Swiss-Prot record:
The gene is US10. Residues 27-36 have a biased composition (Basic and acidic residues). This is Virion protein US10. Induction: Expressed late in the infection cycle. It comes from Human herpesvirus 2 (strain HG52). It comes from the Viruses. Keywords: Host nucleus, Late protein, Metal-binding, Virion, Virion tegument, Zinc, Zinc-finger. GO terms for cellular component: host cell nuclear matrix; viral tegument. A zinc finger (unnamed) spans 255-267. Residues 40-50 have a biased composition (Low complexity).
Amino acid sequence: MIRRRGNVEIRVYYESVRPSRSRSHLKPSDHQEFPGHHVSPGSPGFPESPGNREFHDLPENPGSRAYPGTRDPHDPHGCPGSLDPHGNPAQPAGLPSPVPYAPLGSPDPSSPRQRTYVLPRVGIHNAPASDTRAPKRANSRHRADRPPESPGSELYPLNAQALAHLQMLPADHRAFFRTVIEVSRLCALNTHDPPPPLAGARVGQEAQLVHTQWLRANRESSPLWPWRTAAMNFIAAAAPCVQTHRHMHDLLMACAFWCCLAHASTCSYAGLYSAHCQHLFRAFGCGPPVLTTSRGQGGWCN
């Protein structure tokens, strides 16, 4: 029978047991089958038996020769364990007579006490606790501010939040920066196919236009001259040769870097450019502006 209490399982076993029977009905030879049985005084295993050689080798001790079944003639009252002349146990003087015990008889199979009865055994086991945890569910919904991951998820980090970044740029840089964001979002939606063939050329043309306007307004008077010159040289060389999304990604990041140089001390994308535009940081000695050099030098088209 099994009972449960919380996480504990109690099992009750029933075992058939017969009461022990008296050995008085067994033969003398049957006593040898039970270890620890008592031997009679006349048996070879008894210490006083004539067949026990170890007993005869012991030294005589007159004070230790009072054995059960004998009586000291000098002791009128007897000693415990001695027998009287009639063969009954002797009782020392001053002690009450022992209560006689009824002899053990042979077991009666018809007696209710001798019948087989059942003893229960109880075993406590730890029942296996059921798993109450809710099954794991795949989260198929993505956060609203994070697009689903794709093989090209490490590309095109410029997202919709960059539109708010527009308000921190000078007015003559905002149109070009908006074009960079739109092309970046368009390419990020379809990274399994090659980027649009005309997108790179369009970005390159607008970059040269805005850079020419900036040169006219800030010729040799801006501390950003080396870095913007390095960025525009890279853009002019890369725009005609865009073939993969990695090429498009590098081109767009260089364009965004060119725009954000206008507020380099407060730009929130500084960490982003540190990861993707390190090749533009060492701009000292980059050479003359791109408008005075031949197109295509130093790019992927060589």
